[in-house]
Amino acid sequence: MTCSQTLGNNNTNKYQICEEIGRGRFGTVSRVYAPATGDFFACKTIDKASLSDDLDRACLDNEPKLMALLSYHPNIVQIHDLIDTDSTLSIFMELVHPSVSIYDRLVSSGTFFEPQTASFAKQILQALSHCHRYGVVHRDIKPENILVDLRNDTVKICDFGSGIWLGEGETTEGVVGTPYYVAPEVLMGYSYGEKVDLWSAGVVLYTMLAGTPPFYGETAEEIFEAVLRGNLRFPTKIFRGVSSMAKDFLRKLICKDASRRFSAEQALRHPWIQRAGETEERFI
């Protein structure tokens, strides 16, 4: 494949753009080539003119800073480089290729098998445990932000734009996240910490098994009302083939009382996660 337009600083063309592989609210994601090393990367280029308020600008600053805080972890997309100009910010990251997001897989094929879900759950929790150890709270765990490397079924968490750094014992406030996956304490305006990520992860995993989220509504307001009611159900028609151990695990994460909700480390010790991989099936 031919790579043409160049990106670089100080008249040094460090990267060549090969193709666009994604597009979002603030810009594009491209596959780029670094001639000096022969490596390929994913480049998220953000158009600063598209940032409409202080929250957008904070997200712009957050992602590279938070990703740089985290040492290498196999289940987190790694940052490689940054090019900041007056008009754009380009974040160069590990290229996960070929890959598919959990969201795209749900749209194309529906539910996941339970062994597969348990294996992916373990990797998601390992990534969150690593983040929380460094004080990083993602705050937007959702299927779109979880990639699967199709070469080896490795899960990679990405997009830290909504994230925040919290010191030990610190909490924060503010409604951040995506309607189906946001924790109830966030919606209530309470102070919160890292356990919001565990709620979101639980909702993602429920959705992988059921093909639909546990709290549904036609509008954001209806979804928020369902989340705040917190009536977690496992309809027999949908969950007939899902183990009681898996349902117990989900109850530990999708727990309205954050003080009783599992941390990432506690979740990793749950029997359902401990047994993950015993009958694992390949991701297709």
From Swiss-Prot:
The positions annotated for binding ATP are I21, G22, R23, G24, R25, F26, G27, T28, V29, K44
The answer to whether UniProt assigns keyword GTP-binding to this entry is no
MF terms from GO for this chain are: ATP binding; protein serine kinase activity; protein serine/threonine kinase activity
- What tissue specificity is annotated for this entry? Expressed in rosette leaves, and to lower levels in flowers and roots. Barely detectable in siliques, cauline leaves and stems.
Q: Does the keyword ATP-binding apply?
A: yes
Q: Which CDD domains match?
A: STKc_CAMK (cd05117)
Expression is induced as follows: Up-regulated by light, cycloheximide, phosphate starvation, carbon availability and high pH. Down-regulated by phosphate and phosphite. Not under circadian control and not affected by nitrogen supply.
- Enzyme class, UniProt record, top EC level: transferase
What are the catalytic residues?
A: D140
All copies of the Protein kinase domain together span: 15-273
- What is the documented disruption phenotype for this protein? Retarded growth and loss of light-induced phosphoenolpyruvate carboxylase phosphorylation, but little or no effect on the metabolic flux through the anaplerotic pathway.
Which E.C. number(s) belong to this protein? Answer: 2.7.11.1
Q: Which UniProt keywords apply?
A: ATP-binding, Kinase, Nucleotide-binding, Pyruvate, Serine/threonine-protein kinase, Transferase
The UniProt activity regulation field reads: Constitutively active and not activated by phosphorylation.
Q: Which residues form a coiled coil?
A: none
Which reactions fall under this protein's catalytic activity? L-seryl-[protein] + ATP = O-phospho-L-seryl-[protein] + ADP + H(+); L-threonyl-[protein] + ATP = O-phospho-L-threonyl-[protein] + ADP + H(+)
InterPro entries membership: CDPK_Ser/Thr_kinases, Kinase-like_dom_sf, Prot_kinase_dom, Protein_kinase_ATP_BS, Ser/Thr_kinase_AS
Where would one find the signal peptide in this protein? none
Q: Name one GO biological process term.
A: response to light stimulus
An additional note in the Swiss-Prot or TrEMBL entry is:
Lacks the autoinhibitory region and EF hands found in calcium-dependent protein kinases.
Q: Can you tell me which family this protein belongs to? A: Belongs to the protein kinase superfamily. Ser/Thr protein kinase family.
Report the protein's function.
Answer: Calcium-independent kinase involved in light-dependent phosphoenolpyruvate carboxylase phosphorylation.
PANTHER family documented for this protein: SERINE/THREONINE-PROTEIN KINASE (PTHR24349)
Put simply, this protein is called Phosphoenolpyruvate carboxylase kinase 1
Originating species: Arabidopsis thaliana
Q: Which gene encodes it?
A: PPCK1
